[in-house]
């Protein structure tokens, strides 16, 4: 089974000026889809779609894992329920975990869980850490979000 692995912030949803997902006064993440995301992904609803996201704000106490999970469910709702699953790394770079991109942990965990053929799969992201994680996991192809979603 081939999968489409997707980064979250800056790939699927908008960032604020400090390159974070915006939050409301309660700290809830505000999920606003970037242009063309829903239109591009909707026809691919029969593919495995797996989101992998670094969310160091959890360990920094900016927001909770529950708030990130709520945001992921809101994202899936906005996309019409087409996401197969997701993995969230709550660690900071200093934690030196195996899941935080550019390491491969989140991708390989999801691949094992869903029986994914990594070589036949694609990763879409907006940063070099996404490309490096895909490469480390053995994902067959990486495409930058601006190219995949046709942003100028």
Task: Annotate each predicted stretch with a short phrase.
Residues 9, 56, 124:
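Short glycine-rich loop/turn motifs that provide flexible caps or phosphate-binding loops at active sites
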Residues 1-50:
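Active-site neighborhood of HAD-like aspartate-dependent phosphohydrolases
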Residues 10, 53, 133-134:
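Hydrophobic alpha-helical segments that mediate membrane insertion or helix-helix packing
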Residues 17-20, 52-55, 87, 108-111:
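A short alpha-helix capping/helix-coil boundary motif
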Residues 12-13, 57-60, 93-95, 130-131:
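Short, active-site-adjacent cap segments at secondary-structure transitions
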Residues 20-22, 26, 60-66, 95-98:
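Short, flexible/disordered intra-domain loops and linkers
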Residues 37-72, 83, 87-92:
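Substrate-recognition element of Asp-dependent hydrolases with the DxDx(T/V) motif
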Residues 1-4, 66-85, 93-123, 127-152:
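Asp-based, Mg2+/Mn2+-dependent phosphohydrolase catalytic module
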